Every structure is written in structure tokens, then in C-alpha cells.
Amino acid sequence: MWGVTPTRLSSAAMKRGVIAAFAAAVAALSVSGPATAEPGQPAPASTGIHKIQHVIVIMQENRSFDEYFGTYPGADGIPRAANGVPSVCSPDPTTHACVKPYHNTHDQNLGGPHGPKHAVADIDSGKMDGFLTEARRPAACIKKTGNPDCATVDSSKSPDVMGYHNGSDIPNYWAYASNFVLQDHMFEATAAGSWTSHMYTVSEWAAKCSTPNDASTCKTSLPAPKSMNGVEYPWTDLTYLMHKNQVSWNYYISKGSEPDCEDDAQTCGPRPQGVTTYGIWNPLPYFDDVKQDGDLTKIQDVSNFYQAARAGTLPKVSWVAPNQTVSEHPPSLISTGQTYVTNLINTVMKGPEWNSTAIFLAWDDWGGFYDHVAPPKVDQGGFGMRVPAMVISPYAKRGFIDHSPLSLDVYTKFIEDDFLGGQRLDPATDGRPDPRPTVRETLPQVGDLSADFDFNQTPRPPLVLPLRPHTDLTKSSTGSSSTGVIVIVIAIIVVGAVLAFVAFSVRRRRRAKVLVPSH
């Protein structure tokens, strides 16, 4: 533990008179953050967790732990028999076979449906065998641009939800794991998709409110809103506490597009995404406290992140959200996402603030891909599926695998412990009551990251990696044969039309020459 005590006190403790008051005062001193110098004196050196002056949360999309690290040495990966063959499988209702996890070298994957009801079905009361059943459902996706097999899954081939990748496919991600910290029991905050994960990342709750701007009418909700138009979030998010405590922050967003749905689709048509657009990956513009605090300008384009990292002007807290192209959200390419993440991390490592930075890299949900570890049940919302996650920092232990049960809530908890003296997003203490059923950061199942750091070690040097490393990934995708055929047919039609037009033009010119009278 960090030695940081949350400021929330029980009613019993407050009845113990003078002794309790004294204890509370001592506790308050213990959570007051880094020591400050007397006027005219040099500032004392930061110690422990407070050596981290910059927290960066990089959130990628839709991959399970077993899909990316199921064969990583020493991790709780895909169970295997003595001969090395996977000993687990998922029933395929179409072929009636039980499909084992297999090495998938395709750069483009399709994944499976990944909303709340699909999480329940995939988990299947802890049996973890519903992945192919969900991927095979005729309504498992909505027919939109970008999903060649949508609504008409070919019974001759299996969806790729049982596929996994190894270190030859994603070498940079495995390099970060082997040089820093890999967390092999990190669970998404809720058994749902992207919307709830991003909501919990900034506010530790996802809810829908029957009356706009009235937090008392809000109730926990896992499905994403059917429409993002006119949505408002009146409960407290983490930026409110940071604003009140003068802790700098920015939410960096990549301009482009994001999927316009998540619950019933493997992939969806894109919707525009930018600094001012509301979306499942950019939730803060919806929060009323962000508007009231005048902090909408802190939601910025990712280009500002690169500039700040190079100049040494990063805020205390940075969230970095991708666009569709670089997100790794199927059907986007894995290699493109890896290049994007590597560029973010390289830029920080080359900058002047690397020695005081902690980067938390994670994927927001499982994307319908297989994972063999059943998540713990902590409240009505979660936890959700296991996802890849890493800690990258000069104070991160080298090559350490953290087997502790964790959830993505732990990032908020770390920020609160480092910069807010342990204060939680708690209606009892933050001055903005809301009816959230639990204060997530106080749940013991959330865990903490104290095992992942060694603040007594000499700061680790940067690990600058190639942006486009050699990989064994191939550019064709599982189930993409139909796409290839369609492309070929379209190409033939286009070429044929061009040739026909040329032939017609030639004949017309010849006819015109014949009809011209001679003089």
C-alpha cells in the first residue's frame, strides 16, 4: 500500500470523541500529499508514489488478455495439456465442434459482439464457453460497411473469436511486457463494452438519468445510449476533484471516427469523432461539472499531447483516446494500433519528463474474443472480462507479472492517491451527491498498483522501439475471402466499364470521320 488513507470516515469512528478527532487529524496529515517547502527553502524531493508527477492512461480497444498474451511465458495464459495443445475449447453451434484457441496471424480480425448481454453469455456462469455461440447468432451484427460477414456468417468457416496472437505478431507489446509490468488479472470495470469502460475511467460510474441534469434520477446502466444526442451526465467525474485541487489534466482525442454502436454489432459504421463531438470514447463533454468548471478546453486533439510531451509541459493527468483507425477495434489493423501506441510512448520517453511519468496501457473491453478466466463479481455492474494491461514507467519493476486481481478502476485510485491525498469520488465527501451504489475505489477487489513499482530503484532508461517492427501478421483477415471476391468483382466491373467506354468513344470518332464531307 502507498500509506495513503482515504478521507471517508465511518459514522462509528466519528463518535469516539477526542481520541477519534486526534486520529482523524493524523490521518489528514498522512494524506496531504507531497511535503511543501517553507518560503525561501528548496522544495523537498518527492518520495514514494509522489515521484510520479505525470500519469498517462492510454486506452485501446476490444482485445482480451488471452488473445494478446495467452502464450506469454509466466502469465496466466491459455491452459494447455502436457503436449502443448490447448486444453480448453468453445462449442460452435453451427459445426457442432468444440473449437480450441488457435494462432491467428491475420492483422485484421472481426471479433464478436461485446455488449452487456454478450458478456453474460460469453462468461456463461463461469464456464467461459459462450464466445462462438454469440459470434454465430444471426443478429450478432448489423449489416453495415466494414463487416463482410455481417448477418450472413458463412457456416463453412469459424469466426475468429478463438484466435490469439503471439510475440512475433505484436513484438512491441511483448517488449513492453518483458521490460516493464504486465498485469494478467486486469478486468474491465463492467461486464459491458466501450461506453461503460470509458465512463468508469473518468467517473467510476455509468448511468442513465430519467430527468436531465438531475443526478438523483440516475441509475446504473450498462448498455450504451441508443443516441448520443442530448445526453447529459450530472454526476461527479474525476476532473471535478482535480479542478478543485488545482491538479492539471487533459483528455486527448484523435480526430477521425468511432463505431456508432457496440451492443449488437461486431463492427459498425463510423460516426465522426473530434474534440467537440460527443461519443463513447470521448465522454467528458457530456459532464455538467466539466462545463461548469470551464474545462471543455482541456479536451484537446492528440497533436497537443505530442507537443506537450516533447516540450516537457504534460499535465498531471492525461487520458489518450484513439480513433477507429488506430484503436485496434475490429476490423482495424492490429499493426496500425501498435504503431500508434509505440509513437505515443516513444514521444514521452524521448521527452524531458520521462523520469517522473507512469504510463498505464490497457484495452477497454474484450471485443468478443476468447478468454479463459472468469471475472469476479463485485456489484451490479462488474467486473467485466479480462483485458491486457501494462505499467510502463522508470519506476516500474522490470519484467514483472502482476498476478493480483485488479480492475481498470485502479487507475482512478492511483490518481487519487498520488494527487488528491486519497480522496475518492464519494458523494459523502465530494460535495456533489449522486446515487451511485458503490464507491468503486474503496472496494478491496479493485486492488492497487503498489506491487508494480519500486520507488527505490534508479529510474529506468527509456525503451524506444521501432514504430513499424517486423511482424508475422498477414494483411488478409479471417473471413475476408468474401471481401476479396467482392473487391475483385467490383474491379472487373469497373475495368469492363472503362474498356466499354473507350471502345464506344473510338467507334464514335471513326463514325464521325466517315460522316465528315470531303472538299
Predicted segments — roles?
Residues 6-7, 26, 94:
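Compositionally biased, low-complexity segments
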Residues 2-21:
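Bacterial N-terminal signal peptides that target proteins for export
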Residues 496-519:
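C-terminal membrane-anchoring or membrane-association module
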Residues 37-480, 486, 490-494, 516-519:
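N-terminal pro-sequences and low-complexity stem/linker regions of secreted or lumenal proteins
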Residues 24, 489-501:
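Core hydrophobic alpha-helical transmembrane segments of single-pass membrane proteins
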Residues 20-30:
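Bacterial N-terminal signal peptides
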Residues 13, 17, 478-483, 508-510:
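Short, Lys/Arg-rich cytosolic juxtamembrane segment immediately N-terminal
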